[in-house]
Swiss-Prot record:
Presence of the UniProt keyword Repeat in the record: no
Name of the gene encoding the protein in the UniProt record: lysS
Sample GO molecular function, one term: tRNA binding
Full protein name: Lysine--tRNA ligase
Catalytically driven reaction(s): tRNA(Lys) + L-lysine + ATP = L-lysyl-tRNA(Lys) + AMP + diphosphate
Cofactor: Mg(2+)
A Pfam cross-reference name: tRNA-synt_2
Entry GO terms, CC: cytosol
Any one Gene Ontology BP term: lysyl-tRNA aminoacylation
EC code: 6.1.1.6
Record text on subunit structure and interactions: Homodimer.
Enzyme category, top tier: ligase
Cofactor comment text: Binds 3 Mg(2+) ions per subunit.
Primary subcellular site in the record, as a coarse category: cytoplasm
Length: 496
């Protein structure tokens, strides 16, 4: 029975295919692993698509390909079918006269089965590059049907839960994750070319630190101690700068026990790097160069369409302080209103934005910025002069100790990167840790712990340093025009 021409539910198809597999086993089929592929579909198409039909016949090009059957047309004593590999699809022509035994078996194979094919390239009368099959072998029997006659998964959540099916059925999904891979490779190339050393730091920390976030908690049985999945590698990377590795970077996972949204996943990938004898201005310049490189290398353009609008990486990236950004996007607000607790509270009350009575001036300014301005920063924009109150690891500004030499980098209304001149004064850092502990004791679950070992490392001397973290998942969203972070993470977290 051919399921392609009869409407069957998935359980019926599964049962029929199980029977087919049982019959195959009795004839000696054992999921063979001796076929060796020598060519990819896309490479063959690129090399021979423009070759004239007669010229191709004269060349007698022999190929060996393998992939999944995704389309087939059985026409009496001859059939066409398409196989799909990681690079794309190519057509195969199989004749009963050439391979009578295989052809009889082929009629009972199904969409989704994986085959190996050897043969000679030719072009059909319509000009399609095709393999004239001289050898065909079933390599894997597929027991479950491809979705929706191979037009893709309609259920968005099912795409996330069964990514393996999504990747089979959805070319756009495959392209998304290929771009992700190319992007990470380009990050590494740029960092290596700029003399940064790639390192690996612990994923389980005895003390959570490096960011304001709620950690995942676990327990080390042998050591009998509480451990935390890392929320950021920052403090370990800066220890390495203390140790003499003056330019370091790491691409790895961070874990934050927080909400899930179109922009947040509890497990996410970041590039984090540190450079001695540099400040946050140097890093902003470096970031512009980095993004130019990424655009050129991965997309071959510096203008990217995202959700119907164009992001222009060619223009100099705008730089605004937190206060300047608020005033730019709120022309009705006076600068003096941002300078007092009373003024900021009034603004937040008028806008219906909640805050705590214990929030300081800097925190109130940030609430106003994040809730009303951030989403409007569509073109690449650096926001600088973050309040010291919310920047416990950043160096204070020499001109205004209430703010830090820190920036956040925004594109399409979301934070893509965070960087600053590092605080290398051990006594100042210890005092800020103490304030964080006070906030934690007062109920702030995201406040930092006091890391005495990190303070000791600073006491050995951290050179003037700047560091930055870049969210790779969010950047992949931009480069692939994806609306949700779940579209760019292979296996995102979902409710059971």
């Amino acid at each position: 029975m051919s399921e392609e021409h009869v409407h069957l539910d998935e359980s019926e198809v599964y049962h029929i295919r199980k029977q087919k597999l049982a019959e195959l086993r009795t004839s000696g089929f054992n999921f063979p692993n001796t076929f060796r592929r020598e060519h990819l579909a896309d490479a063959l198409l690129k090399q021979y698509s423009e070759t004239e039909k007669q010229t191709l016949e004269q060349k007698h090009v022999k190929v060996s390909v393998a992939g999944r059957i995704v389309l087939r047309r059985i026409m009496g004593k001859a059939s066409f079918f398409h196989i799909q590999d990681v690079s794309g699809r190519i057509q195969v022509y199989l004749r009963s006269n050439d391979l009578p035994d295989v052809y009889e078996q082929f009629k009972h194979w199904d969409l989704g089965d994986i085959v190996g094919v050897q043969g000679e390239l030719f072009k059909t009368n319509t000009g399609e590059l095709t393999i004239n099959a001289e050898y065909v072998e079933l390599l894997t029997k597929s027991l479950r049907p491809l979705p929706d006659k191979f037009h893709g998964l309609a259920d968005q959540e099912l795409k996330y839960r069964k990514r393996y099916v999504d990747l089979i059925a959805n070319e756009d999904s495959r392209k998304t994750f290929l771009i992700r891979s190319h992007l990470i490779k380009a990050f590494r190339e740029f960092m290596d070319d700029n003399h940064f050393l790639e390192v690996e730091t612990p994923m389980m920390h005895p003390i959570p630190g490096g960011a304001l976030a709620r950690p995942f908690v676990t327990h080390h049985n042998t050591l009998d101690m509480t451990m935390y999945l890392r929320i950021a590698p920052e403090l370990y990377l800066k220890r390495l700068v203390v140790g003499g590795f003056e330019r370091v970077y790491e691409i790895n996972r961070n874990f934050r026990n927080e909400g899930i949204s179109t922009r947040h996943n509890p497990e996410f990938t970041m590039l984090e790097f540190y450079q001695a004898y540099a400040d946050y201005n140097d890093l902003m310049n470096f970031t512009e160069q980095l993004f130019h490189y990424l655009c050129d290398k991965v997309l071959a353009t510096r203008q990217i369409e995202y959700q119907g609008q164009v992001i222009d990486f060619n223009k100099p990236f705008e730089r605004l302080s937190v206060k300047e950004a608020i005033l730019k996007y709120h022309p009705d607000i006076k600068a003096q209103q941002l300078e007092t607790l009373e003024g900021c509270r009034t603004l937040l009350n008028d806008l219906g934005l909640p805050y705590k009575e214990t929030d300081g001036l800097g925190k109130l300014q940030i609430i106003l910025f994040e809730e009303t301005v951030e989403h409007q920063l569509f073109q690449p924009t650096f926001i600088t002069e973050y309040p010291t109150e919310i920047s416990p690891l950043a160096r204070r500004s020499d001109t205004n100790p209430e703010v830090t030499d820190r920036f956040e980098f925004f594109i399409a209304g979301r934070e893509i990167a965070n960087g600053f001149s590092e605080l290398n004064d051990a006594e100042d850092q210890a005092e800020r840790f103490r304030k964080q502990v006070e906030e934690k004791d007062a109920g702030d679950l995201e406040a930092m712990h006091f890391d005495s070992d990190y303070i000791e490392a600073l006491e050995y001397g951290l050179p003037p340093t700047a560091g930055e973290g870049i969210g790779i998942d969010r950047l992949v969203m931009l480069f692939t025009n994806s609306q949700s972070i779940r579209d760019v993470i292979l296996f995102p977290h979902l409710r059971q």
